[in-house]
Amino acid sequence: MMKTTLFAALAVLSLSTPSVADQAQIENATATKSGNSWSFSVTIRHPDTGWDHYADGWSINAPDGTELGYRKLLHPHENEQPFTRSLAGVNVPDGVTEVVVRAHDSVHGWSDKTYTLKLN
């Protein structure tokens, strides 16, 4: 009886705990400097299921966590995986030599995994 109860409790917990596998993942990112600002292209993979659960944005952050830019994704990409979107006009402070890219989805929020990109 104790084993059955423990197994049932663990099964319920596993269903209610978000899985890293269901979070949006950054597969690649590139940066290009143009004048005083930067353009970023970010490739994301996420098992979009429609409007109820999809990758809905990504951000460019300084190493200290300061958000430098945000790209909102306006619709699901169920049939386009992975997909790449760009953001231009991002001002990166002097002295910042790398940025951290974070993906967001409509159910899990910010992904636990980030992508660090060195700026050249």
Residue map of PLM features:
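Bacterial N-terminal signal peptides that target proteins for export
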Residues: M1-F7
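N-terminal signal peptide c-region/cleavage motif recognized by signal peptidases
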Residues: S14-P18
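Short, surface-exposed binding/anchoring microloops in extracellular/periplasmic proteins
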Residues: D22-D56
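Beta-strand signatures of extracellular beta-sandwich domains
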Residues: G57-N61
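Short, solvent-exposed, Trp/other aromatic-anchored flexible loops in extracytoplasmic proteins
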Residues: G69-E98, H104-G109
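Short, solvent-exposed mixed-charge patches
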Residues: V90, L119-N120
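Edge beta-strands of extracellular beta-sandwich domains
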Residues: G109-L119
